[in-house]
Each structure stands twice: as structure tokens, then as C-alpha cells.
Regions:
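Conserved catalytic palm subdomain of right-hand nucleotidyl-transferase polymerases, strongest
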Residues: 151, 355, 441-443, 697-709
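Conserved RNase H-like, two-metal-ion catalytic cores of nucleic-acid enzymes
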Residues: 22, 26-29, 33-78, 94-106, ...
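Extended two-metal-dependent nuclease catalytic cores across DNA- and RNA-processing enzymes
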Residues: 21-24, 47-48, 98-270, 464-466
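Conserved catalytic core of nucleic-acid polymerases
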Residues: 485-488, 536, 540-543, 598, ...
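Conserved "right-hand" nucleotidyltransferase catalytic core of DNA-directed polymerases
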Residues: 251-392, 411, 454, 462, ...
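Short alpha-helix plus adjacent loop in nuclease-associated cores
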Residues: 95-109, 113, 161-190, 245, ...
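C-terminal polymerase-core module
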Residues: 562-569, 573-626, 794-842, 846, ...
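Acidic beta-strand-to-loop metal/phosphate-binding motif
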Residues: 78-82, 127-129, 152-156, 354, ...
Length: 930
């Protein structure tokens, strides 16, 4: 048997190991907890518990410490964090760290749990007032090396490079890198003993260390290479020419201070020494309690399954045999027909199997299948390659033969399949004449339904969160950028473990996620009855695509270009000079320096902003911002739609094929890309022109059906307000009825302006709009807007009562729900920052309505597609979904019966206390049908 035919044991954990045979005493490991705290917070997705407690930093920091325990068995390990309050550096320099923003609330909430876990792990935890964690680490490192003990400092802080010596090494577990003396020279171009002077020269904006103005790393290194140290640089400062020389001489008085601030102390007067810092026995009971509280599921399983759960020494705090990331896996590359037959037989007998395709492209219309992978049991998976065609590629089974053999299995609806984003696999297999059926589970959707905002829902992120594993990344085997290989070009010995791991991880993720869905029946119902049945519906819509008129778009694009040229000319005349309308820097100079317009808002760097909300405010009083806004709007339409849509017409079908995304938005709404249909303007003339380019094929019409005021109807249902319910039951114009109530006039006497104001109030309150926001929209004062809101709630008290109750529920539970039980978690609902809390409250009010609307349109899509597939396959096909609208291609002879059936099924998608009205239009293009 060749090496290729042998099972491959895939090891996915990269370890940093020191040669323990060269030293009798293991190194002391000093962990810079504060450094990892911030890095984990910013690097990892914003994970949360079911009660909305953030856990991203907890997971990140504890993962790093656990990895260090594995990599340095037997070593004394000490974890150091910064103390609250000022340090001696603030006494030296009052402005030290003065400009650093406060710690985010959702990070501050994670510090105590991290401290508790470190202590439960039996590790010494140090927090020393008056100094920083760096100084404590520097002092302990100095003590250890003076006793002949080597030191490993685990940190992500570049300042620590000054501690490196022949006996002190830095490691960064986030990047799996180590830095000894040679590493410092390689990274910085100078030795460890020069790092402090380097830091003094370049300064630190975050810590507010002055440094030398405009002196970057290259300049500092050049000076240090020439003159060795800061004192010599100061002595030779007159030899530095140009502006940078002036800056250096200006900084001479403050450079000693900068050096003092940058120097890590190695002589802190600690009340303890290394001898006093004892490792204790890990408290598994306490640790298990903490892991459960913060829902760290993979670690819970490790502790519960450990043979030594009652008595575990600090020296073997992490046992590889119980760590899912380090268990041996059997991944097989199948290149033998007999072995394939064996796997297919097993798959046919399995109640559920994980399935994945490897392809040549992420674009489903262009992708060819290179191989397929399967998993039935955790830790065992197979990859069947048949399309690797690089030079020297080993012999593989024939693609057509394999796919024909798999076709009955893959098309059997009774054979349950599990995958990660199976919609993509279904689309790709369709390119090869296979119609995937039996989609029983999808881990991407399981994760999304459990918590739409808690994590990214890609497999790599989910593996880290739920399994505690780092998967093999595509970039690690294919490379990056322009030179990245497609999967058919990747060496089979690398491609095999990667592909097999995909199936294995998917299976194990399902085993972790499905039980959580089962715990909450309503979430399980959302998954099983709404999101999962939608997968084949969206797949068929994507494959069908939509026809567009390239000539219509080209003509529109030319008109946009002409109008943009006119706007540019008008803007230049208004400004009194030519400038680039797309340059924020030039706009700042024109607006604020030349024209003296008021500064509404500044950028994070302190420059006057030219962002769209600022221009909208300025446009009320000034012509130039209005011209810029219109130019930007047309430029975006041109680049995003009129120029781009013709390029997206697929050569094989003559249609455009969008991609719908089920696991992106927080509320459950679908999003789309290539093209993004959701961003086509709804009410503007330019948006109408783009919709005119979506056309019906010969013999067909386009039918567009959408829900009338669905979110307001949902508000009436959820709030139970008698006034709103009555207005909808009577079929009244809800905006006219609201205007009559708010302005105290008869319905027949409502003016156009009053109706427009009432419409703004109706929709504004749904989105939690404040009096200030409503006033800006209606162009009235804040007091007047508040009066409108007060009158609205006087007339519709049930709405106010509902909003108050939903705010309270959000604060109590940390989430809100749609009518069908979909949850939206609100991590900032109890934030100390009032602005964040108020924003979360506005989301809490709107999310149940927007999310329920999303659930209803999804239910309608499944119902309509089932009806069309069963009764009208030749008469109509659903091709697009945008917001609350469905677009169908309908045979001209079947328009009336399809319209009747479509409106009936869409109206029946939900049972509300008010009628759910659907309006369907018909035309030769989308605009006519809209």
C-alpha cells in the first residue's frame, strides 16, 4: 500500500517547545495577563453566554494559559495583571496614559472571571499597586536569572523585548512565535539592551510617552546603529540634518523622561519572592463551576471526562489525552475503489453523516468539485479526491465514476446529511447534475439560531468557540494573495487532512450545538421550521438567477456619468476652485478652512469629519454639501449597480446569480451579495431605473408581491393596542389614521404634510427614534417632536406599554424574541455607558418587529416554493427576495392564477390579530411590477 493510501493522523496543534534536555531546572514562565487580555478582546469574535455575559477575552486568555501549561510541563508559572489606579510613572509624568480611552464595559466584566479561573487552576496571580505588570515580571525575571534559572515571558507587548537576554526568552502564544536575543535583532535591527532607548525615541501615543516628533522605527534604529545609545545620540544631535534634526534637538530635554517611562523596572520592592509563589492543586470543582457559568463547553467536557477530576496536580493541569485538540484522528485519503465502496456502504447505513465538497472556486456557478469528504464518527473522516491536477499529482479515482456512484446516496431525501453551509454544496453539485436532497442539519444555521450576534458562524470560528480547536486554515495550505492556489493545485498530502477535518469538525460541532437547540424548544422550532427548510429554496433561487438588460444599464450608466459631471462642475463653481469630490482631505480644506462651515463632528484623529451624516446636516443650510451628497449617491449607484451588474451576467446562463446569506444579520433578515439586492434604493428615481433593468424572459412577466406595512401590523399584534388594531381591521390608511389622532383632526381633513409627519412618527417609533431624531427628520424643534411623540402614546397607550415591557425584558433576560421565538441577544443592554445602553434599548424595541417580519417572509418563501414545485413548475418560479418582497417569473397565461395563489399563501404565512395584506403587481420588468 502506498503512503497515499495509508490513514493520515492529522495533528493540528502547533506547539512551542523548549529543549528540556539541556537544562535540569524547567524555566519559570511569567505570563503578562494584561497584554493578553486586550489582545484576546480585540482578536477574537465577541462571544457571549446565553445570558449575554461577554466571554471572548475569558476564552482567549485562559486558552493561552492552558496552552502554556501544555508546552511547559513542570514549570513554575506566574500570571501577572495590572492593578487599578496610577503608578509611579504618573508621578514622573502627569500625562502618562492620560489620553488612553477607558476600558470597554464588556471587557471590564471579564476581568474578575479570568482572575477566578487562574486561581482555580492553582496558579499564582499577582496584582501589585503602584507599578505595572511589566515591572513585576521584570523583577521576577531578574530574580530568577540571578539564581541561574531560565525565564520564559509570555506576552504580546513589544516593550518586553528589553528584558531578553541569554536566559530570558519571549513567547507569544497568540502568534506562536518566540524571541530570543537573535530574534530581537531580527525584528528590530538592534539588540535587547538598546530597546529602551529605541522606545524613548519613537515614543508611544497610546501611553503618551513624548519621544521625538516624526521619529519612526527606521530613524530610531538608524541612529542607534550609528551611535549605540541615547546619550550618544543626544551628544551627536547637531549632526542630524533637516527637519528631523530640529525635532530631535527640541526633544533633548524630554528624552531622559521618555527613557525613564519606557524602562521596565527590575527592582520592585515586592513582599514576596519566587520561592513564595507556590503552585497549588487545581480546584476542579471550582473550575467546573466557572466553566459552566460562562458556558465554556469544550472545557466542561474535558473536566467531566477526566480520570483524575478529584485530584489533579498543578504539574499535569492539562492532560493531552482529554483535550479534543490533541486526540488522535484518523483521516483517510481514498484513492482505491474498494475503499470507496466500503465508505459508501457505511454511509448508506448511517443515520446521519457529515458531508463536504472541495472545489475550485467560492463562486458556486463557476466551481468544479475537486473532491468530497465524509464523517460518521468523531475523529474519523475520509477525503475522496478526483480533481487534483497539479504536476506530479498521484493517481485518483475518476470524477464521473465517483459522482455517479454517490448520486443515488446524495439525491435520496431519506439519507440524512449534515454540513456547514450546505446551500453552497447543493449549488456546486448541481453543476455536475446532482440534486442534493436530505439536508437534515447545518451547523452554520445551528450556531446562528443559537446566537446570531455571539460569534462568526464560519467553521474555523465555531471550532475555536465550541471545541477549543484551531483548525487547519485554507491559507496555511494554499497560500495568500495573488499566488494563492486553488484546491485542485494543492498537494494531496496537505489537502487530504484539511478536507477530512472539515467533515470531522462539522460532525463534532453538530454534536455540541444540537443539544443546545433542544434545550430551548422555540429555538429548535425556528431552526427546524424556518431556517433549515429555506436552504433548498434559496439554492434553487440562486441557480435560477434573474435576467437583466445590459443595454438598459449601460444607458443608465452614461446618464449617471453625465449628471455626475454636471454636479462636479456646480461644486467647483460653488467652492470657487477645482478639487477632487472624492477626497476627504480636500473636502475638509474647502468646507472648514476656506468656507468656514461649522464643524459638526470630528474623526478619531481629530480632523473635521466629512462623513455622510455630517454632510446631511450641513446640507440643510449649505449648497456644496448637498451637491457632494448627490454626487456620492450617484457614484455609488454607478459603481455598485449600473457598471457592475452587466459584468455579473454569467456566460453559461445569461443571467445574474446572487448569493443569499442566512447567517449574517442580527435580526434574521437575509442579506445578499454579488449583487447586493438589499441596497438598491427603494423610493428614489435612480432606484426605479435600476429595477427597470431586471426583465422578464419572452413569454413571461415579472410578478412582485410584498407585504403592506408589515412591521406596523406586527407592532399592532405584539402591543395589542386597541387603536392600532381597530385601524388595521377597518382597512384604514394607518398613516392618515395616526395623523388624525396625533394632530386632533378628522381623518378626511388630514393634510399631505400631516400624513407624511405621521408616517415618520409611525416608522420612527418602531426604530426607537428619539425626539431629537424625529425633529431632524421632520425639520421641527425637539420640543415639537416630543409633543408629537407624547400625543402618539396618549392615543396608542398599548404601544407605550409594550415598549416599556420589552425594554424591561431586555434588561432582565439580555435578549428579546420574535413572535416565533428567534432570539436577539443584546450584550450592551446593561452597559455602564448610557449611549451604548440606549442604543441597545432602541434595538430591543425594533428587533422583535424586524425579526418577526423576517421570519414571516421566510415562512412564506418555503410555502410558496413548495406550492409552485408541486403544482406550477412550468408556470412560475421564484427568483428574487428583497426586504419584504418576492419576485417571480410567471408565464403570461398563468398570471391570474399565480397572483391569487401567491397572495393567499403569503397572507397565510402568519396568524396575526390584524390582516396581513399582500399586494402583487405584474410587469415586463421589476419596476413595472413593483
Amino acid at each position: 500500500m502506498s503512503e497515499l493510501h495509508k490513514p493520515i493522523n492529522a495533528s493540528i496543534r502547533i506547539r512551542i517547545r523548549f529543549d528540556m534536555t539541556q537544562q535540569q531546572t524547567p524555566p519559570v514562565v511569567l505570563v503578562d495577563g494584561s497584554s493578553y487580555l486586550f489582545r484576546a478582546y480585540h482578536a477574537l469574535p465577541p462571544l457571549m453566554t446565553s445570558k449575554s455575559h461577554p466571554t471572548g477575552a475569558i476564552k482567549g486568555v485562559i486558552s493561552m494559559i492552558r496552552k502554556l501549561e501544555q508546552d511547559f510541563p513542570g514549570s513554575k508559572m506566574v500570571v501577572v495583571f495590572d492593578a487599578k489606579g496610577k503608578t509611579f510613572r504618573n508621578d514622573l509624568y502627569e500625562d502618562y496614559k492620560a489620553t488612553r480611552p477607558p476600558m470597554p464595559d464588556d471587557l471590564a466584566m471579564q476581568i474578575q472571571p479570568i482572575h477566578d479561573m487562574v486561581r482555580a487552576m492553582g496558579l499564582p496571580l499577582l496584582i501589585v499597586s503602584g507599578v505595572e505588570a511589566d515591572d513585576v515580571i521584570g523583577t521576577l525575571a531578574h530574580e530568577a536569572t540571578s539564581k541561574g534559572i531560565d525565564v520564559v515571558v509570555s506576552t504580546g507587548d513589544k516593550d518586553m523585548a528589553q528584558l531578553v537576554s541569554d536566559h530570558v526568552t519571549l513567547i507569544n502564544t497568540m502568534t506562536d512565535t518566540r524571541m530570543d536575543r537573535d530574534g530581537v535583532v531580527e525584528k528590530f535591527g538592534i539588540g535587547p539592551e538598546q530597546i529602551v532607548d529605541y522606545l524613548a525615541l519613537v515614543g508611544d501615543k497610546v501611553d503618551n510617552i513624548p519621544g521625538v516628533n516624526k521619529c519612526g522605527p527606521k530613524t530610531a534604529v538608524k541612529w542607534l546603529q550609528a551611535w549605540d545609545n541615547l546619550d550618544n545620540i543626544i551628544e551627536h544631535s547637531d549632526e542630524v540634518k533637516g527637519k528631523i534634526g530640529e525635532y530631535l534637538r527640541e526633544a533633548i530635554e524630554t528624552l531622559p523622561l521618555s527613557r525613564q517611562l519606557a524602562t521596565i523596572k527590575t527592582d520592585v520592592d515586592l513582599e514576596f519572592g519566587l520561592e513564595d509563589l507556590k503552585l497549588r492543586t487545581q480546584d476542579d470543582g471550582q473550575l467546573l463551576e466557572l466553566f459552566r457559568e460562562y458556558e465554556l463547553r469544550s472545557w466542561i467536557a474535558e473536566l467531566e471526562n477526566s480520570d483524575s477530576a478529584d485530584e489533579k496536580s498543578a504539574d499535569d493541569a492539562v492532560d493531552n489525552s482529554t483535550n479534543p485538540a490533541s486526540k488522535e484522528k484518523t483521516y483517510t485519503i481514498v484513492t482505491d475503489q474498494a475503499e470507496l465502496d466500503t465508505w459508501i456502504d457505511r454511509l448508506n447505513k448511517a443515520p446521519l453523516f457529515a458531508f463536504d465538497t472541495e472545489t475550485t472556486s467560492l463562486r458556486y456557478m463557476d466551481a468544479d468539485v475537486v473532491g468530497v469528504s465524509f464523517a460518521i464518527e468523531p475523529g474519523e473522516a475520509a477525503y475522496v479526491p478526483f480533481g487534483h491536477d497539479y504536476m506530479g499529482a498521484p493517481e485518483q479515482l475518476d470524477r464521473e465514476t465517483v459522482l455517479n456512484q454517490l448520486k443515488p446516496l446524495l439525491e435520496d431525501p431519506k439519507k440524512a446529511k449534515l454540513g456547514q453551509n450546505l446551500k453552497y454544496d447543493k449549488n456546486v453539485l448541481a453543476n455536475h447534475g446532482i440534486h442534493l436532497e436530505g439536508i437534515a442539519e447545518d451547523t452554520m444555521l445551528e450556531s446562528y439560531v443559537l446566537n446570531s450576534v455571539g460569534s462568526r458562524h464560519d467553521m474555523d470560528s465555531l471550532a475555536r468557540q465550541y471545541l477549543g480547536e484551531q483548525t487547519i486554515t485554507f491559507e496555511s495550505i494554499a497560500g495568500k494573495g495573488a499566488k494563492q492556489l486553488t484546491f485542485n493545485q494543492i498537494d494531496l498530502e496537505q489537502a487530504g487532512p484539511y478536507a477530512a477535518e472539515d467533515a470531522d469538525i462539522t460532525l463534532r460541532l453538530h454534536q455540541a450545538l444540537r443539544p443546545q437547540l433542544e434545550k430551548t424548544g422555540r429555538l429548535r422550532d425556528v431552526y427546524e421550521n424556518i431556517d433549515l427548510p429555506l436552504v433548498p429554496v434559496l439554492s434553487r433561487m440562486e441557480q435560477r438567477g434573474a435576467m437583466i438588460s445590459a443595454s438598459t444599464l449601460r444607458k443608465h450608466s452614461q446618464e449617471l456619468a453625465e449628471r455626475m459631471a454636471e454636479l462636479e462642475k456646480e461644486a467647483h463653481e460653488e467652492a470657487g476652485e477645482s478639487f477632487n469630490l472624492g477626497s476627504p482631505k480636500q473636502l475638509q480644506a474647502i468646507f472648514y478652512d476656506k468656507m468656514g462651515l461649522p464643524v459638526v463632528k470630528k474623526t478619531p484623529k481629530g480632523a473635521p469629519s466629512t462623513a455622510e451624516p455630517v454632510l446631511q446636516e450641513l446640507a440643510h443650510e449649505h449648497t456644496l454639501p448637498r451637491l457632494i451628497l448627490e454626487h456620492r449617491s450617484l457614484s455609488k449607484l454607478k459603481s455598485t449597480y449600473t457598471d457592475t451588474l452587466p459584468e455579473l451576467i454569467h456566460h453559461r446562463t445569461g443571467r445574474i446569480h446572487t448569493s443569499y446569506h442566512q447567517a449574517v444579520t442580527a435580526t434574521g433578515r437575509l442579506s445578499s451579495s454579488e449583487p447586493n439586492l438589499q441596497n438598491i434604493p427603494i423610493r428614489s428615481e435612480q432606484g426605479r431605473r435600476i429595477r427597470q433593468a431586471f426583465v422578464a424572459p419572452e413569454g413571461y412577466k415579472l410578478m412582485a408581491a410584498d407585504y403592506s406595512q408589515i412591521e406596523l401590523r406586527i407592532m399592532a399584534h405584539l402591543s395589542g393596542d386597541k387603536g392600532l388594531l381597530k385601524a388595521f381591521e377597518k382597512g384604514e390608511d394607518i398613516h392618515r389614521a395616526t395623523a388624525a389622532e396625533v394632530f386632533g383632526v378628522a381623518v378626511d381633513d388630514v393634510s399631505g404634510d400631516q400624513r407624511r409627519s405621521a408616517k415618520a412618527i409611525n416608522f420612527g417609533l418602531i426604530y426607537g427614534m428619539s425626539a431629537f431624531g424625529l425633529g431632524r427628520q421632520l425639520d421641527v424643534g425637539r420640543n415639537q417632536a416630543q409633543e408629537y411623540i407624547d400625543r402618539y402614546f396618549e392615543r396608542y397607550p398599548g404601544v407605550l406599554k409594550y415598549m416599556d415591557s420589552i425594554r424591561k425584558q431586555a434588561h432582565d433576560d439580555g435578549y428579546v424574541e420574535t413572535l416565533y421565538g428567534r432570539r436577539l441577544y443584546l450584550p450592551e443592554i446593561n452597559a455602564r455607558n448610557k449611549q451604548l445602553q440606549q442604543a441597545a434599548e432602541r434595538t430591543a424595541i425594533n428587533a422583535p418587529m424586524q425579526g418577526t417580519a423576517a421570519d414571516i417572509i421566510k415562512r412564506a418563501m418555503v410555502s410558496v416554493e413548495d406550492w409552485l414545485q408541486e403544482h406550477h413548475q412550468d408556470d412560475a418560479r421564484m427568483i428574487l427576495q428583497v426586504h419584504d418582497e418576492l419576485i417571480l417569473e410567471v408565464r403570461e397565461s398563468a398570471v391570474d392564477k399565480i397572483r391569487e395563489g401567491l397572495e393567499k399563501r403569503m397572507s397565510a404565512a402568519a396568524s396575526l390579530d390584524v390582516p396581513l395584506l399582500v399586494e402583487a403587481g405584474v410587469g415586463n420588468n421589476w419596476d413595472e411590477a413593483h
